[in-house]
Amino acid sequence: GQQQRVALARMGAARPGIFMFDEPMSALDSYLKSALEQNMLDLFDVCNRTVLYVSHDIDEACRLCERICVMHNGHVEEIGSIEDVVRRPQTLAALRLTGCKNTSRARKIGEEEVEALDWGMTFNVGREVPDNVAYLGIRASYFHVDNRAERGRNSYDLHVARVSDSRFERLVLLDAPRVDAPTRLQWKVNKVGVPADGLPQAGETLRMHFDASKIHLVCR
């Protein structure tokens, strides 16, 4: 991180009209990245200049920037505040950039119903579905086990194909109903304070519920 700190000092001394950064922390470990982020925020506060910051890390961008521009294949897909881009993405590129692990081609099948073509699943989204809807997205932490006796709307019995653990989460891969689905659904489970036998296990079948308000619809 020393080279990056020296570069920051040189940039500040030059007093440019615009600061431009191209993934300056991509090669740093988490400790150095956190320290350098604080140095950069201090510099931004003191210099009061426009900053153009390029990153593939949405959390990094949210911490350092006020507005986000989503680029895909050299074109601007959308631009807006962090709230707009993260909470209300308008394109598939924005969905994926903001960390949405589960995306599928989609088509409208009812006033408030949409079919996830890649998964063989249908959802009632509780709002009008655009006629030209093209994709839907569901974030990996936005669905949960449905403990009701009867399967309700937006609930599916899904087989746990595989699990893998990080320090604080378990990633659960769920087989979609469509036999030849190109991808599995990813579900993130917080495992802090949860006994091992209370976590999802490979081979289980779980009834999962997908909250209508948490299903993103985009038209391109």
Where are these regions (language model features)?
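C-terminal boundary and immediately downstream tail of ABC-type ATPase nucleotide-binding domains
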Residues: 87-110, 137
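ABC ATPase nucleotide-binding domains
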Residues: 1-93
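Non-catalytic connector elements of ABC transporters
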Residues: 112-220
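Residues that scaffold the ATP/ADP-binding catalytic core of kinase and kinase-like folds
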Residues: 85-88, 97, 146, 218
